[in-house]
Swiss-Prot record:
UniProt lineage: Bacteria, Bacillati, Bacillota, Clostridia, Eubacteriales
Protein name according to UniProt: tRNA pseudouridine synthase B
Substrates-to-products reaction catalysed: uridine(55) in tRNA = pseudouridine(55) in tRNA
Key word Isomerase present: yes
InterPro entries named in the record: PsdUridine_synth_cat_dom_sf, PsdUridine_synth_N, tRNA_psdUridine_synth_TruB, TruB_C
GO-annotated biological processes: mRNA pseudouridine synthesis; tRNA pseudouridine synthesis
Annotated active site: 38 (nucleophile)
Length: 289
């Protein structure tokens, strides 16, 4: 069995907890996730099953949408409510100033990842160092905040919906907003509403899954990759491309755009993987068959 499960992760579970439960239901089938969702966060967590695990990296390139709750007036070590409190301050701000500051983060910005994150530096996870009381300098990374919509303000709490690029840490965003408002801030709640083609409305709660019904919720791998355009390989090229030989025929190359990834199909609408037109030839980047 190969495909994706669109899981609605509950609060309090790690992403690996979800993987382990799914693996148990599928009797130790190869299972993995497409990107960590913090234990205190809930929402969309796509789980790859079987050969779909080979395509996990191609699913994290997409936009993500979160519903976040920011608690102003408090700063914690982890930038969320579960961390030790570092500082507290009174919140004496006008709503219009809060809104203006939050919206100023829209666009391409630079963000410093939190110490409590799964990022690796010199082979070590940052959270492993943080738990030992070690803080190291982290390089700023370019991210994109496509949009922010304020949902509600009941000080000291502010709820907002954010659409962002991969690699965005909402905890860092909340911390930065609090710092700029000179009162501190920490992420209080977080729900991922969507990632790529996976939406919370179409997700399945983990508690409803069991070994009897889980198979009917597995989505074909190519549906998870609908963000990439498709291209059909004619019969005359199928043997070549399946054996790792590039297609150099201009009539085929003209159907694709240089340096762009494609979902590749053969006759019968059979998905065979991801390919790319690079250096005047089309070649498979990742095979599904």
């Amino acid at each position: 069995m190969d495909g994706i499960l669109n899981i609605n992760k509950p609060e309090g579970m790690t992403s690996f907890d979800v993987v382990r439960k799914v693996r148990f239901m599928l009797k130790n089938e190869k299972v993995g996730h497409t990107g960590t969702l913090d234990p205190m966060a809930s929402g969309v967590l796509p789980i790859c099953v079987g050969r779909a695990t080979k395509f996990a990296d191609y699913m994290v390139e997409s936009k993500k949408i979160y519903l976040a709750e920011l608690r102003l007036g408090i700063t914690t070590e982890t930038y969320d409510r579960e961390g030790s409190v570092v500082n507290t301050r009174g919140v004496y701000l006008k709503k219009k100033d809060i809104i203006e500051e939050i919206l100023s983060f829209q666009g391409e910005i630079e963000q410093v990842p939190p110490m409590y994150s799964a990022l690796k530096v010199n082979g070590r996870r940052l959270y492993e160092l943080a738990r030992k009381g070690i803080e190291i300098e982290r390089k700023k990374r370019k991210i994109t905040i496509y949009s922010i919509d304020i949902v509600n303000i009941e000080l000291p709490y502010v709820s907002f919906k954010v659409t962002c690029s991969k690699g965005t840490y909402i905890r860092s965003l909340c911390n930065d907003i609090g710092n700029n408002l000179n009162c501190g801030g920490t992420m209080w709640n977080l729900k991922r509403l969507s990632t790529g083609n996976f939406n919370i409305a179409d997700s399945i709660a983990l508690e409803y899954l069991d070994s009897e019904n889980i198979l009917k919720y597995i989505i074909p791998i190519d549906k998870a990759l609908y963000g990439y355009p498709e291209v059909l390989v004619e019969d005359e090229y199928v043997k070549k491309i399946l054996n790792g030989i590039s297609i150099k025929d201009e009539s085929f190359l003209s159907k694709t755009i240089k340096d762009k990834l494609y979902r590749v199909y053969i006759e019968g609408n059979k998905f065979i993987g991801i390919g790319m037109n690079k250096d005047f030839q089309f070649k498979m980047v990742k095979l599904f068959v």
